[in-house]
């Protein structure tokens, strides 16, 4: 399903005393069924400071653009969608948003065609490879692998920060209200275990099934030789060399901070590094998705590109189980196979300190 287009906005407030914009800026979106003006009206309700837009940018896949901006400027975040910007950084953020929106606009037709390809059974043929296809595949694989690495390091940082805060709270050096992290136990909602029901009572299960056909796509798979070519080297991508060097040093430094015997002393550095890691992870995720669309577009209706990648879409028969009807006719049996999954813990890190409220 196509991601919605819309407007990415930069909003700020007028200081009632100076009549100038404050340093706090909200970066958010409205999808194509709404307008920034209506969003401002909603924010204005009960707010004594006048809210105005600093910049509004039209963009396809606008949610993707918003996530990118929030990640890249994580260090300036003061809570939620609010950021503290000096004039220079604000200009940088707006110009960056305009550039990335242009990238998304340039891909709009490609994305639309790829979404149509995804609904169509692929042929048995493979497209002949060329240097452009190999370059797309190398870049996609490089970004995909390093984005996963960044995400893993961020997870380790989150756990370490939470451990340090737990220790500080235990020593009365930090109150629970001041902590930036939150450990949550996630309790999955009860769900009907269709597979268990099918394996135990197949005949009854089939009474509530219909067979339908649909096109199912497999994950885009990169050829082993291309993976070996790309590896973790940026030799194919000189424009990313400096950035990749920064990331490599940042990961090494962050790992040393995590392993530090005095974690409290490096707490602030961990927070700073987390923001930098998040910036690069957001960039890599954004680029990876765009290169994936380009590579799939190069596949077209074929099942892949010879020696480069495969992207198969097959017409399959699918059992469609009518759970609603089954529950109505067999409520006790439905309850018997409705179970709650095992709970698990997740660590969340707040996005900056909350913006001061001025009345």
Enumerate the language-model features and the residues they cover:
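Extended, low-complexity amphipathic alpha-helical repeat segments
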Residues: 277-283
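Non-catalytic accessory segments flanking enzymatic or RNA/DNA-binding domains
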Residues: 1-167, 174, 188-266, 279, ...
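Extended, charge-rich alpha-helical interface modules
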Residues: 155-203, 241, 289-292, 296-335, ...
């Amino acid at each position: 399903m196509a991601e919605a287009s819309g407007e990415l906005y930069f909003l700020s407030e007028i200081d009632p005393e100076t009549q100038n914009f404050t340093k706090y800026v909200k970066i958010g979106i409205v999808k194509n069924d709404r307008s920034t003006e209506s969003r401002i009206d909603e924010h204005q309700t009960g707010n004594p400071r006048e809210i105005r837009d600093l910049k509004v940018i039209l963009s396809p896949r606008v949610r993707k653009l918003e996530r990118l901006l929030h990640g890249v400027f994580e260090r300036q975040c003061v809570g939620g969608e609010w950021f503290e910007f000096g004039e220079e950084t604000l200009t940088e953020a707006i110009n960056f948003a305009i550039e990335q929106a242009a990238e998304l606009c340039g891909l709009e037709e490609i994305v639309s065609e790829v979404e149509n390809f995804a609904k169509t059974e692929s042929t048995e043929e493979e497209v002949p490879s060329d240097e452009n296809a190999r370059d797309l595949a190398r870049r996609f694989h490089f970004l995909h692998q390093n984005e996963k690495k960044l995400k893993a390091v961020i997870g380790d940082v989150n756990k370490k920060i939470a451990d340090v805060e737990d220790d500080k709270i235990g020593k009365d050096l930090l109150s629970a209200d001041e902590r930036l992290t939150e450990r949550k136990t996630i309790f999955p909602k009860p769900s009907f275990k269709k597979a268990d029901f099918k394996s135990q009572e197949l005949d009854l299960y089939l009474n509530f099934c219909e067979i339908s056909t649909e096109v199912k796509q497999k994950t885009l798979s990169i050829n082993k030789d291309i993976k070996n070519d790309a590896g973790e080297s940026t030799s194919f991508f000189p424009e990313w060399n400096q950035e990749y060097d920064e990331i490599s040093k940042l990961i090494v430094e962050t790992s040393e901070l995590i392993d530090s015997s005095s974690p409290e002393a490096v707490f602030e550095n961990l927070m700073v590094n987390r923001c930098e890691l998040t910036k690069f992870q957001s960039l890599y995720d954004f680029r990876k998705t765009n290169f994936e669309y380009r590579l799939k577009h190069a596949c077209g209706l074929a099942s892949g590109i010879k020696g480069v990648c495969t992207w198969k879409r097959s017409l399959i028969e699918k059992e469609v189980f009518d759970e609603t009807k089954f529950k109505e006719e067999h409520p006790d049996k439905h309850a018997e196979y409705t179970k709650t999954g095992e709970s698990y813990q997740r660590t969340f890190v707040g996005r900056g300190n909350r913006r001061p409220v001025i009345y």
